Amino acid sequence: MIILIIQGVSLCFLIVAVVLWGLYFPHPSPLIRRRLPPRARWPEAQIRKWLRRGSFQSGFLNYFYRDPERIPPVGNSILAPADGLVTSVEVHEGIRYLVIALSFWDVHVQRSPVSGSVVKVESKGKEFMDGEGRGFAFLMEKPCPVQQRVVISTDAGEIAVRLITSLAARRIETWVREHDAIVRGQRIGRILLGSTVVLELPESVYLLVDVGERVWAGETIVAQEMNSA
């Protein structure tokens, strides 16, 4: 009798597993989802399907909105404003541009790379586009994508952080205002879903990261003044 019960329970479990596998195919079944790393737990194709539908699985939203504490390294070096992959490092008309692409699985809270005073928070662009920001770095008007540009005055000159939208990420939250005094590593805003952050620096600073490297907001040192190198 006990053997029959065990066999029955096992059969029921197998049926449930098969049904869930079929319902969620080709995406992970809820039975194994928690055991998978984030990229496998929520594949890009599944996230884009949710985007088209306008609704998301609650577990992914809880993961996406995470906002871990960050401890900035000691010193006055310039920190990464966002989590992500460095996709472009260029100089144009005296400005050094560092482009960071955020994926769906990165923390989407942006942080100030330096301490200083906010001199400007401006909205730019009129369109939503896809891409990694390389072609957007030097554009300030149409066809530049919708974005928020936070300009910070420092002893080394003005530094700007550009939060750029995409077709997927159409909302930006900016948490600082003009004349605010901010500190290095402070939260300044958030882009909803994967997009791009551009850090604008004076040409005189010395970059410490290159294309292909991953960076973390408020923790990774990306540059420093030449006289500090």
Segments predicted by a language model, with ranges:
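Contiguous, well-folded functional domains in the mature portion of proteins
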Residues: 1-229
